[in-house]
Amino acid sequence: EDTNISLWTDHTCVLRSGSALCSANNDAIQNNVVQVSAGNMNTCNLRSDGTVECSRLEAPVWLSLVTAISSWDDHACALKSDSNVECWWDNTYGQIDVPSGLTWVVGISLGSYHSCALKSDKTVECWGDNRWNQSIVPSDLSGVMEISAGWDFTCTLGQTWFVRCWGSSYYGQTNVPSGLTDIIEVSGGLAHTCALKSNNTITCWWRNNRSQVSF
């Protein structure tokens, strides 16, 4: 069975064979779901027909033909089949102001108040909150295979299977451990970062106040 897990501070969602169930949601199991994205007190489900349903951040009624979703604190974004991005809800820091001319997007990831897009040419574009430079993409960044925005930082996985992070490092969450190689997936959280290696082991670093980097 195909299984996907998405979690946040106060709830966890599990997607299995097209059915989504969240631990803090008393609603019935949601069917015909192909992706689930858990944000702060909000969960968005992408249905097989390309529509989106969110528990709190209600999606625009006209939104359709969606292929991927991402949600975090108080905003959400959707990647559409035409490779364009639509975002909605809170815009305090401009996090839903999708840059004009942004096209050929193949992936999206949201931080608390910033949004990032991975383009087909393996470059990255971010917008929104920039108080910790989390939206300033390094000028020499290229060959990106995956992007993951954390609370106030951003990480990418490159073609050479190396991780690169920028933005706030108050807890050291952007300080990628030296010698970390053979990475196949990266994920940024509140103040810690985790990477999955090709040998199916996981390496996490920095803030560990709740044992979030201890295995």
Task: Walk through the language-model features, giving the residues of each.
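An edge-strand/N-cap motif at the start of beta-rich repeat modules
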Residues: 1-27, 31-38, 43-45, 52-59, ...
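Intrinsic low-complexity tandem-repeat regions in disordered proteins
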Residues: 11, 33, 51-52, 66, ...
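Residue-level recognition of a conserved intra-blade site in WD40 beta-propeller repeats
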Residues: 7, 15, 38, 46, ...
